[in-house]
Amino acid sequence: MVGVTRTAITVRRGAGHAELVLLTAAAAWAWVVLRRGDTGSGAMAWELPAFLGMWTVMMAAMMLPATAPVAALYARTVPVHRTPRMTAFTAGYVLVWSAAGLPAYALATGAAHIAATHPAAGTAAAAAVFAVNGVYQLSPLKDRCLTKCRSPIGLLLRYASYRGPSRHLRAGAHHGAFCLGCCWSLMLLFMAFGVMNPWAMVGLAAVVTAEKRLPRGPLVARAVGLASLALALAVFWAPLLAPNLTGGGMTGMTRAYA
């Protein structure tokens, strides 16, 4: 009876840690919604520090809901001080996605320049973006990374061997690296749809969560890959499918170049 009670307490504590991560994601979404009013005006040109801050909050909003169960499970492997150590794990995870903002900035700047100066080339660039995502979504490397994100038990066993004051940060960063490997091509679609495009954020966040949490997540990944390949062809006939590259609905950084 005592064992059952302890198990129930552990489960409840794990659920509480998941809720903490979800609350963080909700706060990030609230920031994005409020900030959207500023970025949509076209008066603001993103500098790198501002872009990295915005990108980090975006990634927290989009990626943490799918990662909350893993963070909570990690907290349950820690005997004491679970909340601060889970916070360090989550921070390490977000740090990886924050670092991904550096190439994202270069790509977003390039997309803005293409849309403003070479609209015809923008359609070809959009087709390339959709094609890259489609091919990667169907690749063995995507499957491998997605498997690690969906079934992290092996990773958690590895993290148990980590030592030192930074072990929890390292564990989160390691898990974040696998998730980056799983989802980087989806984030590439922001080049086509526009950074800070709220509908793109919601759609891509839904895809990420479905891939990682639904029983048929790998099937979702393949379906998205096939749809992306179809968009790579369709964008030549319907350029507005990629508004950020074809100038049909410029948002965020692209507007700064208009």
Residue ranges and their predicted role:
Residues 18, 22-25, 123-130, 134, ...:
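Residues within membrane-spanning alpha-helices of integral membrane proteins
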Residues 17-21, 47-51, 85, 89, ...:
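Residue-level signature of transmembrane alpha-helical entry/exit and packing/kink sites
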Residues 143-187:
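A mid-sequence, solvent-exposed acidic-amphipathic segment
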